[in-house]
Amino acid sequence: MLKSLLAIGLGAMVGAWLRWGLGMKLNALFPAVPPGTLLANLIGGYIIGLAIAFFSASPSLSPEWRLLLITGFCGGLTTFSTFSAEVVSLIQEGRILWALGSIALHVSGSLLMTAAGLATFYFISGR
């Protein structure tokens, strides 16, 4: 149990630091749809896709690796709550089309990046 908690905690810490850094560097560039938040979700979607395929193909790996990468790192990196707050802020400002665009970018982009991560693994591994 302790190994699992440490794996999740370490992954979450690194993922959250990366998300914070992306937000600090990029969000001011385009406040209507903050690119740091979007990039965090897209990167996280891609990594999750790769990880799901990799861990499915590697069942002998310790489960702590999955916890570290998927639950911890990607959980700390991706940010549904920040995305939700940004969309609500756009709606409150009367910028409905920007809010809808942000929703479309985050949701479709994350799903496409997850599929791309899966496809990348299958392409590289020849499966």
Swiss-Prot record:
Keywords in alphabetical order: Cell inner membrane, Cell membrane, Ion channel, Ion transport, Membrane, Metal-binding, Sodium, Transmembrane, Transmembrane helix, Transport
Gene Ontology molecular functions: fluoride channel activity; metal ion binding
Membrane topology, record value: Multi-pass membrane protein
Subcellular location: Cell inner membrane
Reactions catalysed, as given in the entry: fluoride(in) = fluoride(out)
Sites where the protein binds Na(+): 75, 78
Activity-regulation annotation: Na(+) is not transported, but it plays an essential structural role and its presence is essential for fluoride channel function.
Regions crossing the membrane: 4-24, 35-55, 68-88, 96-116
Domain of life: Bacteria
Biological-process GO terms, alphabetical: cellular detoxification of fluoride
Signal peptide: none
Annotated Gene Ontology cellular component terms: plasma membrane
Family the UniProt entry places it in: Belongs to the fluoride channel Fluc/FEX (TC 1.A.43) family.
Functional description taken from the UniProt entry: Fluoride-specific ion channel. Important for reducing fluoride concentration in the cell, thus reducing its toxicity.
Name of the protein this chain belongs to: Fluoride-specific ion channel FluC
Biological source species: Pseudomonas putida (strain W619)
Gene name in the database record: fluC
